[in-house]
A protein has these predicted regions:
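Conserved N-terminal entry element of GNAT/NAT acetyltransferase domains
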Residues: 1-46, 205-217
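Active-site rim helix/loop that mediates acceptor-substrate recognition in acyltransferases
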Residues: 69-89
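Acetyl-CoA-dependent GNAT
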Residues: 83-122, 132
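A short, internal acetyl-CoA/4′-phosphopantetheine-binding micro-motif in the GNAT/acyltransferase core
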Residues: 125-138
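Conserved acetyl-CoA-binding loop-helix of GNAT-fold acetyltransferases
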Residues: 136-152, 174, 178
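Conserved beta-strand-loop-alpha-helix junction that forms the acyl-donor binding cleft
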Residues: 161-173, 190
Length: 217
């Protein structure tokens, strides 16, 4: 069964109106170790898919991501990411133990990237810490800072890392602000009211929201 024919895959992937050259941008950097963490691409095998599916169906991750999907949809979602340059599924390990799931993606090819002055190499990511016992102690803040630093180092053409937490998610916003990202404003994307943040490479200008895309706070 081709589960991609049954479930919508990469629902946020949007490339209409983008220059052809932007679609040739390589996928986000993966497969790196930094600050005691290893960030590897998820493998489209049973072990990784079942692990990620179990994590993302836990109450604390389902609330934030709304990705509490059946196993078959997760299989289709991971395979679809690995087949494009838009997004990559990531398993984060510490001392050999898997502790988090992330998705690295090119913001210009994402639905949110159509709400601000995105550049073709802009990067973003989402984070889900697997064990609720690991939340609230600074792990998320550390992981954000680690990935931001690595992105700028590994991708010299990336001038901005743009993050888009739910506007009402105070914990996520604090993690982002502790890493010196700047709030660009709020936008509404589908059913979500999000706060858009950016951290730019030293010497680069902050991107701006596109006219008419700002949502009152």
């Amino acid at each position: 069964v081709n589960h991609a024919d049954i479930y919508p895959v990469l629902p946020r992937h949007r490339i209409d109106g983008l220059p052809e050259s932007w679609l040739g941008v390589p996928p986000p950097p993966t497969g790196f170790s930094r600050e005691g963490f290893h960030f590897r691409e998820a493998i489209a095998d049973r072990a990784d898919i079942e692990m990620i599916h179990a994590w993302m169906n836990r109450p604390h991750t389902a609330k934030g991501w709304e990705y509490d999907w059946p196993l078959e949809r997760w299989e289709a979602h991971i395979k679809a990411q690995l087949a494009t340059a838009y997004s990559r599924p990531i398993v984060v390990e510490r001392k050999g133990r898997p502790i988090a799931y992330m998705e690295f993606y090119r913001m210009a090819q994402d639905v949110v990237g159509h709400h601000y002055q995105a550049g073709p190499y802009d990067l973003s990511f989402h984070l889900a810490i697997a064990d609720p016992a690991d939340t609230g102690g600074g792990l998320g803040t550390t992981l954000l800072g680690t990935v931001i630093a690595e992105f700028f180092e590994r991708d010299p053409r990336c001038d901005a890392i743009v993050l888009e937490p739910d506007a009402a998610n105070g914990a996520s916003r604090r993690m982002i602000e502790k890493n010196d990202a700047v709030h660009l404003g709020d936008v509404r994307v589908r059913h979500r009211h999000i706060a858009l943040y950016a951290k730019v490479r030293e010497g680069r200008d902050l991107p701006r929201l596109l006219p008419g895309h700002s949502t009152p706070v």
